């Protein structure tokens, strides 16, 4: 083909139009190649749809909490999907009963330094702690306190899940771990909450997988290491019912620890009063009697007890309706009486005692009321 082109045409310089045309063709070819390769790579990536959804959700959450104009990496976008808007949390301090002392300490230690930072800027001793640990038996209100803290503080809140930091590709877990703290710094003041922290940051041993050990080490380094600023407004809050399984280096980074133990009789009465508030109760209700007979019960147990008691009136109503239907089959000439299903009898003391007996049988079957099973593990 080149032999058909005159020699003079090959040797002469290109005209302006020919240069522009060549550049246009090269640009179009390069763009087509780039987008073709990108389309193939995206099509082969099984997580592409998940990443796209995560990006949309992260942008929506960032807008809800009032963070705009902040550039996030791909890994920070994944962590941003775990953000919680404090305004969407329905739990307040009024929903926590029997823990007045802990609530007061939480307000002074955690919430006040974030809300009144100008009062604490002149002293290193008045800086908020880097970490806070809530520990105690299950069902005693640790997670409830964390929710109320997030609501009251008004800080950005990351509800971190351990599964979010695990990835099958080598090195990805470390990048996600780094993104947790880089995102928290960008949107500070921020609280990073780890529920059941013992399952993620448990005691290290030689049996740990290399990737897991590296992830724990990086988490601690970013949390409180050489690069950590003294004026950082990032706090890690954890909750566990097995503090003895949490690594010692993690406990060192959580100098402020609150023991949320089983409620005493007075606290149980207060919890029962809160749970039953707004319910249709009989005037003969004696919550002090129920509280005195529920030794070793957690707040979660008391809520289940009240739920069972409320169900007894529903069962009575259903049985009465069934008996009326049977009677109407033999009295077809009489007009059927209309009964409003919302009109249930009040919860009585007998209902609560029945619920207490049922809960006691359940706990005896699982041996959860045995004092040996309820002993507290000291937090060193």
From Swiss-Prot:
The keyword ATP-binding applies. Its EC number is 7.4.2.-. Keywords: ATP-binding, Cell membrane, Membrane, Mitochondrion, Mitochondrion outer membrane, Nucleotide-binding, Peroxisome, Postsynaptic cell membrane, Synapse, Translocase, Transmembrane, Transmembrane helix. Residues 38-380 are cytoplasmic. GO terms for cellular component: mitochondrial outer membrane; peroxisomal membrane; postsynaptic membrane. Belongs to the AAA ATPase family. MSP1 subfamily. PANTHER family: AAA ATPASE, PUTATIVE (AFU_ORTHOLOGUE AFUA_2G12920)-RELATED-RELATED, OUTER MITOCHONDRIAL TRANSMEMBRANE HELIX TRANSLOCASE. This is Outer mitochondrial transmembrane helix translocase. The gene is atad1a.
